[in-house]
Amino acid sequence: MSLWDKAVPVGERCILELPLNYTKHDHDVLDKIFRVANNMKNNLISWYDRQLTEMTRTRAWRDNQKSLSNLYSEYADDVEDLEKGKQRIAKKKENAKKKKKTFYLSRKDKEQLRYLQSRVKEFEEKRKDLYEIRNEMIHRYGFSKFDFEKQMNKYRKSYGTLVGIDVAQKIAYSVWDMFQAVLYGKGKSISFSPFSKFLAIEGKKNGANITFNKDKMTVTLGMKSNKIRMRVKKNRKDPYGYETEALSRRVCYCRIIRKAYPKGWRYFLQLVLEGPPPVKVNPETGELLHSMGKGRVGLDIGPQTLAFSADKEVGLEELAEGVQLAQNEIRRIKGSMDRSRKNSNPKMFTADGQVVRKNKLPAECLNCRGQRIWVKTNRYKKMEILLRSLYRKQAALRKHLHRRMTNRLLAMGDEFYVEDMRWKALAKRAKETKRTKKGKILSKKRYGKSIANKAPAMFLSILEQKVVASGGSFQWIITWKAKASQFSHETGKCNKKKLSQRWHYLADGTKVQRDIYSAFLIQHTNKNLESFNLRTCAKDFPAFLKMHQKEIERLQSLDKRMPSSMGIKKAA
């Protein structure tokens, strides 16, 4: 189902991934199907990219966009003032209710509110007319879902019986989503699909194109002469009954995916099943393998580390600890590939290693379309395959480590509180140019590499999904109001600290690790999610301090390198 097709209801679903047992002929057919499907996708993108360019160049489109821009500029202040006025009135009502007083709105406020409401209504009516004109143009140039299906069917027929109608339509929906994001969402441009990044094809139902047979444990793919049937491997042991429970569900549709390995692509079957994910059960005791605990858990997550505080345990851990080793290997291979490319294409680079612009390249370095002709050695091609394999291994390891950590946290409590972080903003480079006292320009880098390697947002989404599925609660506290990293429960005030200051000092001189202390405060968040309960903080702090000291001693005794953001030094 398309992301933009809001009319079609989708129930809760889960995915079971199983390896395929195929011959060399089957592998060749699968490779051919994926290549053709990717070509069809790029053909559709190319067609609609031209349609989009043609539409946006018309005078009617430009006039409509200009009118919309002017309309938003004219009424922006009124819309903002109305929203602020409503918030202010709601706050006054709440304060009056607390003081058990009757709330009255002054005549001046009433007149101002009526004026703003009339302005906003006028704005909405004008906007509606302009958007109707815009949508009519979009429909006229063939940007409806049906038009995408129709155009894709033309490409499908030209490739014979390799790709079924359901698979082709699903590819068309993915392209439609891309253009919908550009026309209605935050999308800026459309990119073509490289074959190395085209990793999945799927049907719309289990009865056509890609069909799974539960009784024979086989999957059928393709049409007529290109039809292949492959056996699906099942875990015969299945100690926790996960696969058995999953296969008892109704299959909504099937998906064939491919993964990069050092010796080439391997293909797998993904079954999209009805209902929530099965739970793993210990066969000896009959209890849940990862059961949920009781109590509050506070989390303070950073680009590389995770601090947690529960009733019986506190801790500070590095996120996805083993991922950095894979990243080091990726960096080494990228360096080798870069040197190989420079040696094989000397005319493409300047003496200092910069890429030469196209307009300054000799004719033999460009093809008939004006694109660069890169010479790739056999060793370079092998390194490309190895690099894809390493990225796949790194992603799988990262997800495995995140899931293992979430299972550990799940046993600590059933109420989770975490700061609402904006990872996209943290990953961006700084806009302002800063200099040292000596005039040297400081680096604009922030946390882009750490966030890409450790994927803290993915960890939180996995944790939230597991907590909610297990019947617990997952709350996001208001970071800019709570200010956990600056707050002190002793004074009840905020004291701004430098980023390099990794320890919080108490009135008696005792020091606590900054992230662990923040997790402790987050654990004791009030119901409004923007302040802390000082009474429970004072009550639970002595027990927390003992657990904190134990955790610091454990970290200091470890014989490994830790992120500098932890502020932990090895014991002498």
Where are the model-predicted features located?
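A generic structural signal for beta-strand entry/edge sites
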Residues: 13, 216-220, 227, 264-270, ...
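Acidic carboxylate diad motif detector
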Residues: 68-262, 448-449, 453
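Positively charged, helix-rich recognition surfaces that bind polyanionic ligands
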Residues: 4-5, 267-572
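Amphipathic alpha-helical surface "interface" segments used
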Residues: 57-70, 189-209, 353-362, 485, ...
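Long, compositionally biased intrinsically disordered regions
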Residues: 2-167, 345, 349-362, 375, ...
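Stable alpha-helical structural segments in soluble proteins, enriched in small hydrophobic residues
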Residues: 44, 170-178, 182, 516-526
